[in-house]
Design a protein with these regions (language model features):
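N-terminal secretory signal peptides and thylakoid transit peptides that target proteins
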Residues: 1-19
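Structured C-terminal cap/extension of enzyme domains
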Residues: 21, 40, 192-195, 210-308
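C-terminal segment of N-terminal export signals and the immediately downstream linker at the start
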Residues: 25-53, 63-64
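Conserved, mostly hydrophobic/aromatic
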Residues: 40, 52, 85, 98, ...
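Acidic (Asp/Glu)-rich catalytic clusters
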Residues: 41-44, 99-108, 132-137, 163, ...
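Active-site mouth loops of central-metabolism enzymes
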Residues: 56-67, 116-122, 248
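Glycine/proline-rich, positively charged
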Residues: 61, 119-206, 210, 217-223, ...
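Glycine-rich, proline-tolerant flexible connector loops at the mouths of alpha/beta enzymes
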Residues: 86-101
Length: 308
């Protein structure tokens, strides 16, 4: 947390209050409304409800052309108020590419950096953290997570030490694809986690039964991965018409329909869709603005897609 992040938050607060002042020659009132924010339960710090994942999309190797295209994607993310970027040593060159992009974006929002430890080796966790710091160009990660519970007992104990010493600000665990939910719930119950990351979307709703209520009870922030089912939702439903009533909660395309379903769950703190396209990033970020579907509308959304 630095002076820049505080000033940014102050600007967003003033904007939300309807106060306008010059910014780049334009009144602030002319800019898009700030995206929705949610508090991290363990501290109350507010973060945007929409972050960015990097799995596959930022694993582009050393290609200058592809890296520069990702700079444009990250620039749009920051221009729209995005903050949380999530990656992992598991994601090939994604962390290296992220470091490349962070050095080249202009006037970014305050980054909320999130990465993971993914190794069965005890000593390997330290090696991965140091490598992530070097690749990103970050001296302190906001969030460090144990990826897919791999060697979680050892790594989580180390993360607790790192948090106390100030090497990281928050700690958490992750799962995806619906794996190991029983084990995941046990760790949630037993450990003082700031964040949990899991898969949730309009078709994959198993976490509604246990993990999301448990996170709410335990005061753990929830990051949602695979909100588009890795593109599967578009393949299944993208050729069907969007219902007219989706405009009532501001969804003008399927991406916003799917994201607003995820973001409207009261236990969800942030979703991290991944994209390599500037236009898709624009659509995604718009989903974090405006009204969200209520409980009745959420049921209507589920019923609609299940009938297609």
């Amino acid at each position: 947390m630095n002076a820049h992040s505080l000033s940014r938050r102050r600007i967003l607060t003033l904007a939300a209050a309807g106060l306008a002042f010059p910014l780049g020659g334009l009144p602030l009132a002319a800019a898009p409304r700030p995206i929705a924010m949610r508090p991290i339960p363990s501290t109350g710090e507010a973060i945007p409800v929409l972050g960015m994942g990097t799995w596959i999309t930022f694993n582009v190797g050393s290609s200058s052309r592809l890296r520069d295209e990702r700079v444009k994607v990250l620039q749009v993310f920051f221009d729209h108020g995005g903050r949380m970027v999530d990656s992992s040593p598991m994601y090939g060159s994604a962390e290296d590419v992220m470091g490349y992009c962070l050095k080249r974006v202009r006037d970014p929002s305050p980054l909320f950096s999130a990465t993971k430890i993914w190794t069965s080796s005890d000593a390997g966790g330290v090696v991965q953290m140091q490598a992530s710091e070097r690749l990103w160009g970050e001296s302190q990660f906001d969030l460090q997570q144990v990826h897919n519970l791999l060697n979680w007992e050892f790594h989580l104990a180390r993360l607790k030490e790192w948090k106390v010493s100030g090497l990281i600000r928050y700690l958490g665990i992750t799962t995806s694809h619906g794996r190991r939910h029983s084990d995941f719930a046990e760790v949630m119950q037993a450990e003082p986690l700031d964040f949990v990351q899991l898969t949730y979307n309009i078709l994959d709703r198993e976490v509604e039964d246990r993990l999301l209520p448990l996170a709410a009870d335990r005061g753990q922030a929830v990051i949602v991965n695979r909100p588009f089912q890795r593109g599967g939702l578009f393949q299944s439903f993208g050729h069907h018409p969007l219902p007219e009533w989706a405009r009532e909660f501001g969804a003008r395309n399927w991406a916003q329909f799917f994201l607003k379903f995820v973001l409207s769950h009261p236990a969800v703190t942030c979703a991290i869709p991944a994209t390599s396209q500037v236009g898709h990033m624009e659509e995604n970020m718009a989903a974090a603005r405006g009204p969200m579907p209520d409980a009745d509308t959420r049921r209507r959304m589920i019923d609609y897609v299940e009938r297609l």
